[in-house]
Amino acid sequence: MLDIKALRADPEAIAAQLKKKGYELDVATFSSLEERRKAIQVETEQLQQARNSVSKEIGQAMKSGDKDKAAELKAQTATLGDDLEAAKTQLTQVQEELESLLEGIPNLPHASVPEGKTEDDNVEIRRWGTPKQFDFEPKDHVDLGEAMEMLDFEAAVKITGSRFAVMHSDLARLHRALTQFMINTHADLHGYTEVYVPYLVNAHSLKGTGQLPKFEADLFKVPVDKDSGNNDLYLIPTAEVPVTNLVRDEILNDADLHKKFVAHTPCFRSEAGSYGRDTRGMIRQHQFEKVELVHVCRPDISEQVLEELVGHAEVILQKLELPYRTVILCGGDLGFSAHKTYDIEVWLPGQGKYREISSCSNMWDFQARRMQARWRNPETGRPELAHTLNGSGLAVGRTLVAVLENYQNADGSVRVPDVLVPYMGGKTVLKKA
């Protein structure tokens, strides 16, 4: 959520910044609501003062024994009380309208975010590795997995529906190996604290990280028995939600920052609006797994922390020897809650192009304001909003796709990357039994 004080001070300047994201701020509506809020707030304060003043007069009239005046003043108090309650109701309504408007406004883009409307306008920052030149026509992961009888989409359709997968034997083990390798690297090499979190979260948590109310259509909602006293829950679209909410409503000591969390979870997305896109294979699924990295830090270091975060995700690809490129997202492709984002795209021979495998974002104080995640500044002694960042380190399914396609052999077998061999019990090749 944006700082409403900044929005009140100069809504036109905020609107100009938001245009980089392709968002048109309704300044007229905001200004109208603000004027109403201020007028009703002044009226409320005046009514409160008037009632307090009359209440004092009642006390004086009672002391002097003037019962008639006291009765008259009590009638005035009752009228003022009714007017005050009506004004408070109006003020609450206007504040709720303002809150609803604010919840729909995206985060401001960083000054370094390039102009642009779509992913075609993203700017490449660097590349690592060279795509392998095969002396045969490389297959995609679907053909490879099905030929080895380790990847079964038909079974998934039978069990659940489209955009799900069933993995067997060594492919399932390779998927697990990737997960363990990623977590171990981030925990042991990069100093992250591993956390295990719920896969179901409440609406408050999703609101805190920015998925609600705007993106409810992308979520899987799980109705809960109202008699239990619980509200409906949602399957997590990313571990970013439960992990970042660990600091919701907290005031962290400076000595406790910055925090670095790593979590492995399944993720669930309805992929609303993705009809017809990536219908083949494991690129875009309703259920997939990710190793998520979350940082909570002081505001003065969040820009350098973003660079660190991207570097940690890149290390995984380097250790797997998978070619990739890193791009900075343009304003039009930037996420709702993001201030600045780098995407890491891995080379997929089966598609002949780079595809996103990690998205690393600095959310600035946008999520922290929604969650009231704060730290105590030792210089002032006062609580201030922290900065939050997150990124995939990496998307496990897409990494598996990249390994299959980049490490394939002419006979349809797949070599296991050297760094994963210990996780595979020494197995070096995946092939049909």
Curated annotation (Swiss-Prot):
Q: In which pathway does it act?
A: Aminoacyl-tRNA biosynthesis; selenocysteinyl-tRNA(Sec) biosynthesis; L-seryl-tRNA(Sec) from L-serine and tRNA(Sec): step 1/1
The record ties this protein, via SUPFAM superfamilies, to:
Class II aaRS and biotin synthetases, tRNA-binding arm
Q: Where does L-serine bind?
A: 238-240, 292, 392
Kindly list the places in or outside the cell where this protein is found, as annotated in its UniProt entry.
Cytoplasm
Coiled coil regions, renumbered to chain: none
Q: Which family does it belong to?
A: Belongs to the class-II aminoacyl-tRNA synthetase family. Type-1 seryl-tRNA synthetase subfamily.
The entry's protein name is Serine--tRNA ligase
